[in-house]
């Protein structure tokens, strides 16, 4: 019998405000890795980490994991770079409870509780890469946050940004990314399709998205 009290995607996709996000993940944090990620075969974070491993060079550190949650992206990154002492990852998330779960895993150098819909108070010109899975989606973070991440990064920083497939069109991610490229803030964008789940058989089981891969332009000079 279906457990009607179990938190799921319908709850996550119906969120309206940052406060809604905080409330949902307060109640979901302790069971997220098992009742959601494990039971659904949630492979999206691993795919984002795999793409980072394929595209990143030695200079693409430290890494900022945006919407880091319980640390699923960082966990796979650590597996790929088990002997790489240079891999430094910071995490940022709106949920203190999710951050507390990830803190226990010892994956991150630092963890920051931040609302990405507001000004992002983090070190400027610091990061060599940004990764994200499950954050740019329905009820969570829109494309406006992308421009806010650029000042946090050094020139030529690598971005691996996962974006929900239907949210991509609904919230006009394509036009926002195109505007950043036209303004010479980012390099041309490559899109790689990602499949979210390996073992989910409900209405969202076949959900897909895109990983947007680009770099912060090395010589960004705004038009006069």
What are these regions (language model features)?
Residues 1-31:
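N-terminal, positively charged/glycine-rich alpha-helical extensions of SAM-dependent methyltransferases
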Residues 120-130:
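A short acidic, Gly/Pro-enriched loop at the edge of an enzyme's catalytic core
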Residues 34-49:
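Conserved SAM-binding loop and adjacent beta-strand
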Residues 160-185, 189:
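Conserved class I S-adenosyl-L-methionine
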Residues 144-155:
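A short glycine-rich, Lys/Arg-flanked "PGG" loop and its adjoining helix->strand segment in the class I
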């Amino acid at each position: 019998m279906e457990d009607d009290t179990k938190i799921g995607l319908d709850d996550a996709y119906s969120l309206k405000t940052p406060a809604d996000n905080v409330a949902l993940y307060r109640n979901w944090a302790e069971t997220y890795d098992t009742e959601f990620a494990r039971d659904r075969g949630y492979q999206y974070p691993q795919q984002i980490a795999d793409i980072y491993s394929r595209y990143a060079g030695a200079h693409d550190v430290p890494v900022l994991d945006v919407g880091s949650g319980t640390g699923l992206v960082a966990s796979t990154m650590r597996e790929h770079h088990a002997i790489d002492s240079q891999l430094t990852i910071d995490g940022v998330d709106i949920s203190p409870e999710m951050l507390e779960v990830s803190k226990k895993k010892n994956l991150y150098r630092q963890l920051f509780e931040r609302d990405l819909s507001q000004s992002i108070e983090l070190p400027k010109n610091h990061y060599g890469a940004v990764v994200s899975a499950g954050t740019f989606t329905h009820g969570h973070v829109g494309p406006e946050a992308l421009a806010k991440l650029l000042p946090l990064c050094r020139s030529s920083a690598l971005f691996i940004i996962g974006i929900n497939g239907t949210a991509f069109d609904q919230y006009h991610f394509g036009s926002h990314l195109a505007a950043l490229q036209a303004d010479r803030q980012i390099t041309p964008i490559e899109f790689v399709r990602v499949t979210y789940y390996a073992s989910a058989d409900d209405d969202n089981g076949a959900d897909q998205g895109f990983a947007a891969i680009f770099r912060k332009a090395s010589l960004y000079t705004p038009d006069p």
